């Protein structure tokens, strides 16, 4: 233990031959003089600007308003129907989605006629409603579902004899089946079982009085 360590074991780290980057320090000026023509003083030691320095007259917070500087009433945001025509604007007003418009929309060449037509239709909505209700009660075919176009074309292509034949509602299922399936449907019981059921004595069906109790 004692042979591997010595009292001056850390002494070799501080020898001059190990300190290769150690040199005598150079002389330096304690208070260097300011370079002339390159720097100008604009503030004092405390940070106050000198009187000859140009300043901006605008405020640093141009849009800032304090609590007491706010207006009493802030107007609502106005909608700008820029790309909406007059017809679309009138449609929105009839739907009730846009009540107040501050700016006029772009007017197209045929917007005046369409606007008059729209206003006329809106006025006649309440007048046309009772007539439509009477039509609904008169027409019996309205409850039936509408046929697609392909069925209408097939009905027109059929001859008049086939179109005139109505299909009864209470059609028997056996009549709609082919003759081969009708013949296959025979009575469920053979004749021997039916005869046995007819000639069965009544004693089998009736129970004695002791069993009934």
From Swiss-Prot:
GO terms for biological process: cilium organization. It comes from the Eukaryota. One of its GO terms (cellular component) is ciliary basal body. Keywords: Cell membrane, Cell projection, Cilium biogenesis/degradation, Cytoplasm, Cytoskeleton, Membrane. Transmembrane segments: none annotated. It is found in: Cytoplasm, Cytoskeleton, Cilium basal body; Cell projection, Cilium; Apical cell membrane; Cytoplasm, Cytoskeleton, Cilium axoneme. InterPro entries: Fltp. Residues 127-213 are annotated as: Disordered. Residues 151-213 have a biased composition (Polar residues). Belongs to the Flattop family. Microtubule inner protein (MIP) part of the dynein-decorated doublet microtubules (DMTs) in cilia axoneme. Acts as a regulator of cilium basal body docking and positioning in mono- and multiciliated cells. Regulates basal body docking and cilia formation in multiciliated lung cells. Regulates kinocilium positioning and stereocilia bundle morphogenesis in the inner ear. This is Protein Flattop. It comes from Danio rerio (Zebrafish). The lineage of its organism: Eukaryota, Metazoa, Chordata, Craniata, Vertebrata. The gene is cfap126.
């Amino acid at each position: 233990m004692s042979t591997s360590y010595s009292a001056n074991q850390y002494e070799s780290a501080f020898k001059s031959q190990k300190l290769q980057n150690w040199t005598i320090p150079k002389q330096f000026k304690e208070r260097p003089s300011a370079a002339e023509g390159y720097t100008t003083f604009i503030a004092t030691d405390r940070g106050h600007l000198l009187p000859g320095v140009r300043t901006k007259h605008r405020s640093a917070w141009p849009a800032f308003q304090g609590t007491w500087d706010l207006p009493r009433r802030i107007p609502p945001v106005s909608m700008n129907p820029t790309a909406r025509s007059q017809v679309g604007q009138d449609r929105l007003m009839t739907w009730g989605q846009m009540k107040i418009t501050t700016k006029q929309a772009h007017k197209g060449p045929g917007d005046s006629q369409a606007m008059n037509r729209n206003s006329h239709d809106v006025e006649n909505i309440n007048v046309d409603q009772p007539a439509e209700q009477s039509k609904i009660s008169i027409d019996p075919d309205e409850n039936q579902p509408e046929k697609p176009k392909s069925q209408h074309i097939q009905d027109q292509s059929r001859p008049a004899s086939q179109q005139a034949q109505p299909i009864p509602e209470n059609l028997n299922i056996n009549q709609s089946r082919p003759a081969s399936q009708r013949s296959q449907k025979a009575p469920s019981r053979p004749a021997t079982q039916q005869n046995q059921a007819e000639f069965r004595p009544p004693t089998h069906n009736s129970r004695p009085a002791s069993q009934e109790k």
